[in-house]
Amino acid sequence: MNEENVMNILHSNREKLEKYKKVIRLAIVTTMICVCGIYYLYMNRHVKFQDKNMAYEISRTIGPNVNPENVKYKDVYAIKELNIGQLGKYDTLEDIKLCKNLVRISVNGGGDKWNSLETNDDVLIVTNKKAETFQKELADLIPELKRLKRFAYSNYCRNCDISDFSFLSECRQLEILRICYSDTTDFSFLKSCKKIVDIDLQESQIKDADDLKSLKNLETICIYDTRLSKDETEVESLCKAFPNAKIFISEDKVQNIDIKEE
């Protein structure tokens, strides 16, 4: 094979290589356009809610003039905070999973302004059977909120008691926790929530400081009206474990800080 033939073959191979590169580039661009198109269509689909009252609550969170029929996936994915109020309003909590990027969630009035409940008729009582269903749903839904940093629950009106919060052990990003007016006695899940800095357990059934002391980064602790707050030995051990934390024992007693400075 002479030199000219060799050069022709090399030139031909280069042309083929360039053609292959163009085909590959075109395929990549086409794929990206298709992926973007599919993503756009998905995000702009209308959401189908399972519970009409949750649909209303989520729509109201998105904006004051938003109707459930107009809510799209891009809208629910943008929600960072959700306060669903009394659980008695709902048949199911499944729609919470639509808000997959939640950072803060309040359940059964955790964070509600309860003075808006003017009479007992405003309180929606949940049966024990329904409360068990809600507990199972929360156990499935809450750990899936991978960005969740604040969880709040209150049974202030004694209308729906969630007695098992072990599902929170999977919420490793939690920084703020509120479990108030609850009959739960098991707080062992706290050992897995290493990032918590602020915890409020007022009117809960916590009886000793052991589980709290497993949290090394606590800055604020509220144990109003708990068995723990009435045990001076346990309170002293808690103060020793967190010498720089604000520890709220009762409305007129705060440990580790000068109340006058507040």
Residue ranges and their predicted role:
Residues 1-20:
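N-terminal Lys/Arg-rich, disordered targeting/topogenic segments
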Residues 2-6, 54-55, 135-138, 235:
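Short amphipathic alpha-helical segments that mediate assembly, nucleic-acid/protein binding
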Residues 14-32:
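N-terminal Sec-pathway targeting helices
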Residues 31-41:
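Hydrophobic alpha-helical membrane-insertion segments, chiefly the h-region
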Residues 42-68:
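Surface-exposed cap/linker segments adjacent to membranes
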Residues 63, 77-141, 147-167, 173-185, ...:
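Concave beta-strand-loop units of leucine-rich repeat
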Residues 71-73:
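Short, structural beta-strand-to-alpha-helix junction motif
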